């Protein structure tokens, strides 16, 4: 146990778990707020606490299963691809916020149920990321979750504001997911033998390339989305303008 805590790699992995948890739990915090917004004031705190407790329980179970599955051949390769996709998706602005369709309940247990179900569905990306950062170490997984969960509950709104103010945080977060994806790829049982025969720098280069790929691809797709939106707006303006001219001519 003492050796584990004195290992620098342990603390690097803990920081990765905390960062991934905080990064991918911003929407979950909004869901909690939306689900409890119609509760009586005196029940809101209970709704948040009970909902978060249930969501945490489900998330821990999901993560344990994910860590167990990651010991099987090809699973880490699939997980790495999923993490790359999650990281890229994180950098692309969404049309609507995930939480806008969350139904607010006026009853305590209805709100709790909404929080648990929504968190379960929205935490799949979180689970894959945390399981990858834990590298099959259950002790590390528990330690990381115990630290990050209270931080999520109390500081996720603050982090959301920071992300709005400093978008570079989102890019760094996406790159982190790409880095973890690269690490997962290098430790899959199928490529482990090949990876161990490579120079030490390769073990850092592959994760670094994963992070770089996510950052570049995500920003490129986001830029394309902005250009496409501007083009659609211009077309709409031209169509509406020509319609107005036709209406005026017919009126004359």
What are these regions (language model features)?
Residues 1-252:
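Multi-pass alpha-helical transmembrane bundle typical of ion/small-solute transporters
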